[in-house]
Amino acid sequence: MNRVEPPYDVKEALVFTQKMAQLSKALWKSIEKDWQQWLKPYDLNINEHHILWIAYQLNGASISEIAKFGVMHVSTAFNFSKKLEERGYLRFSKRLNDKRNTYVQLTEEGTEVFWSLLEEFDPTRNAVFKGSQPLYHLFGKFPEVAEMMCMIRHIYGDDFMEIFETSLTNIDNDFESVNGKLKKKAKDSAADEPAEELEPVNS
């Protein structure tokens, strides 16, 4: 935890933290609703989709990495990963140079589901997207949210933000906009590259 150095005004601190708390809660309620609707045709929940997302971006991730970057408890990461394994979307494995940690990778079916979800994304059904439109039309771009990213970096650390930024770069590299829809690029992506040598884990 970063040390807070005085002087600071306690009233200002209260107003700021409550402003962030209440705005974040309101924003999350809208995000959660739209996220759930996006996933509904695939019978996935938000944690499951987040796990697929992280496994794709890291080309295989440990349960502890999923918990860290997915902002969830280790047991939550493991239990939902097992459910995804049962559906054929993930496979569990051990790295030959790291027998302690359990890793998950997307299966071919899991990768197809992940790609399909992105291709089905419709921004017109997203309240955050629609709420940003006045700013987009005024400045010609979406809000950068640099201040929020700075705060998240100081709360969760550089590793968290590096994965976050990498995930956005990967989407930019792996997909293109075609007639208002995302389409997978024909070229090989990072997810197609061979991962470290793994051995399967018996369920």
UniProtKB/Swiss-Prot annotation:
HAMAP family: HTH_type_Hpr (MF_01911). This is DNA-binding transcriptional repressor ScoC. InterPro entries: HTH_MarR-typ, HTH_tscrpt_reg_Hpr, MarR/SlyA-like, Tscrpt_reg_MarR-type_CS, WH-like_DNA-bd_sf, WH_DNA-bd_sf. Residues 63-86 bind DNA. The keyword Acetylation does not apply. One of its GO terms (molecular function) is DNA binding. SUPFAM superfamilies: Winged helix' DNA-binding domain. It comes from Bacillus subtilis (strain 168). Negative regulator of protease production and sporulation. Acts by binding directly to the promoter of protease genes (aprE and nprE), and by repressing oligopeptide permease operons (appABCDF and oppABCDF), thereby preventing uptake of oligopeptides required for initiation of sporulation. Acts with SinR as a corepressor of epr expression. Binds to non-m6A-5-methylated 5'-GACGAG-3' sites, tested with scpA; when the target is methylated by DnmA, this repressor no longer binds and transcription is up-regulated. Residues 191-203 have a biased composition (Acidic residues). It holds the Pfam family MarR. Residues 13-157 form the HTH marR-type domain. Keywords: DNA-binding, Repressor, Sporulation, Transcription, Transcription regulation. Residues 183-203 are annotated as: Disordered. GO terms for biological process: negative regulation of DNA-templated transcription; regulation of DNA-templated transcription; response to stress; sporulation resulting in formation of a cellular spore. The keyword DNA-binding applies. Induction: Negatively regulated by the Mrp homolog protein SalA and by SenS. Homodimer. Interacts with SinR.
